[in-house]
Design a protein with these regions (language model features):
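Alpha-helix C-terminal capping/helix-to-coil transition sites in glycosyltransferase folds
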Residues: 71-73
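Conserved active-site segments centered on acidic
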Residues: 1-67
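Residue-level signal for alpha-helical context at structural boundaries
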Residues: 36, 40, 69, 95-96, ...
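A sequence-composition feature that detects small, non-aromatic residues
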Residues: 18-20, 47-49, 77, 91, ...
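Phosphate-binding/catalytic loops
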Residues: 76, 82-129
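Short, well-ordered turn and helix-capping elements at secondary-structure junctions
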Residues: 36, 81-82
Length: 129
């Protein structure tokens, strides 16, 4: 199994949804975690509502900083598009998905970002098989 870390600034929207999709689609292929460089401490209610639409309860997730996740060897570190605010994570493979932060988007636009994240996570899982 590959260890995958999804990182954004607040660990409240994009990285949380990526972790959720990793858990939904990557069982037995990837171990997933998410964190933020400046964690908000809460998961965005819009992310919770958006993930509920696809059958995942994100309300049980917590927002973590980099110092609160396991210090393990990362096979993949995926940043969500947070530019200089995302720290350098040591990993065998690094990718930046360049996603807009949906926290101020309307539900329809938020769902588009969610769906892009799901597609990217599925592609990553294929690479890890």
């Amino acid at each position: 199994m590959k260890n995958v870390l999804f990182v954004c600034v607040e660990n409240s929207c994009r990285s949380q949804m990526a972790e959720a999709f990793g858990k939904m689609h990557g069982d037995g292929v990837i171990n997933v975690y998410s964190s933020g460089s400046k964690p908000s401490g809460v998961v965005n209610p819009k992310a919770i509502a958006s993930m509920k639409e696809v059958g995942y309860d994100l309300s049980q997730h917590n927002s973590f900083g980099l110092d609160e996740i396991p210090q393990i060897k990362w096979d993949y570190a995926i940043t969500m598009g947070c530019g200089d605010e995302c720290p350098m994570i040591l990993a065998d493979n690094r990718e930046d998905w360049g996603l807009p932060d949906p926290k101020h988007m309307e539900p329809e636009e938020f769902a588009k970002v969610r769906d892009i994240i799901e597609s990217e996570v599925k592609d990553l899982i294929k690479k890890c098989k």
